[in-house]
């Protein structure tokens, strides 16, 4: 009788449990040793799901559109402007706002990982974390934006800002025509996370 040995799996890495299972096992081990304070996990869950939100960034943009003094502060010292609202925190210690103009479109990327200004943009979208976006937007931003549904005219410069270990960026988009007389609350509704990253432009709803 002959025996065939499959050598293809000899050096294969052992199968791993899903990340969620491993995380839960780690939590139970730490909790069993009394190393997890009461409410600690729930507190962070609330922070990530409710507090870290692009609604905060939209609030900053809406005020900048309607308050020239705040706009100037946001552009010269974004950290101080955000601190007025108490929106600082992890991944938001040093914030820089970059302004779109009729001749300039700004876009944010983190080419090394997926950092964003969590306190005012929320957690990064899946596409933002993808290698394809991180690799391509720095080389061909106009094409990438077009593929995402945002057409930028050829005579408009596109400037890409790469997040660093210290600096987190947000885009201050241009205020759309047709929003004259809108309240800050109304303006906030048209500013999305994609607008704050720079891959989309605020749109006025059509009736």
Curated annotation (Swiss-Prot):
Fe(3+) binds at residues 110, 113-115. It is an enzyme of class 4 (lyase). Signal peptide: none annotated. Pfam families: NHase_alpha (PF02979). Binds 1 Fe(3+) ion per subunit. Oxidation on Cys-113 is essential for the activity. Oxidation on Cys-115 stabilizes the Fe-NO ligand coordinated in the inactive form. Gene3D superfamilies: Nitrile hydratase alpha /Thiocyanate hydrolase gamma (3.90.330.10). SUPFAM superfamilies: Nitrile hydratase alpha chain. InterPro entries: CN_Hdrase_a/SCN_Hdrase_g_sf (IPR036648), CN_Hdrtase_a/SCN_Hdrlase_g (IPR004232), CN_Hdrtase_asu/SCN_Hdrlase_gsu (IPR023900), Nitrile_hydratase_asu (IPR018141). The modification Cysteine sulfenic acid (-SOH) is found at residue 115. The modification Cysteine sulfinic acid (-SO2H) is found at residue 113. Inactivated by nitrosylation of the iron center in the dark and activated by photo-induced nitric oxide (NO) release. Inactivated by oxidation of Cys-115 to a sulfenic acid. Its EC number is 4.2.1.84. It catalyses: an aliphatic primary amide = an aliphatic nitrile + H2O. It comes from the Bacteria. Keywords: Iron, Lyase, Metal-binding, Oxidation. GO terms for molecular function: nitrile hydratase activity; transition metal ion binding. Its cofactor is Fe(3+). Heterodimer of an alpha and a beta chain. Belongs to the nitrile hydratase subunit alpha family. NHase catalyzes the hydration of various nitrile compounds to the corresponding amides. Industrial production of acrylamide is now being developed using some of the enzymes of this class. This is Nitrile hydratase subunit alpha. It comes from Rhodococcus erythropolis (Arthrobacter picolinophilus).
């Amino acid at each position: 009788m002959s025996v065939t040995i499959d050598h293809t799996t000899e050096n294969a890495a052992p199968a791993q449990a899903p990340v969620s299972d491993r995380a839960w096992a780690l939590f139970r081990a730490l909790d069993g040793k009394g190393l997890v304070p009461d409410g600690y996990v729930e507190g962070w869950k609330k922070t990530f799901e409710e507090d870290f939100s692009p609604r905060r960034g939209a609030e900053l943009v809406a005020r900048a559109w309607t308050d020239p003094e705040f706009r100037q502060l946001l552009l010269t010292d974004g950290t101080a402007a955000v601190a007025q609202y108490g929106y600082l925190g992890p991944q938001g210690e040093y914030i820089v706002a970059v302004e779109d103009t009729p001749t300039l479109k700004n876009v944010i990327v983190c080419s090394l990982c997926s950092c964003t200004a969590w306190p005012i943009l929320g957690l990064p979208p899946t596409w933002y974390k993808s290698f394809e976006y991180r690799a391509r937007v720095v080389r061909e931003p106009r094409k990438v934006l077009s593929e995402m549904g945002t057409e930028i005219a050829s005579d408009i410069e596109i400037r890409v800002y790469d997040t660093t270990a210290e600096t987190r960026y947000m885009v201050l988009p241009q205020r759309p025509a047709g929003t004259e007389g809108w309240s800050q609350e109304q303006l906030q509704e048209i500013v999305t996370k994609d607008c704050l990253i720079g891959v989309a432009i605020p749109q006025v709803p059509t009736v």
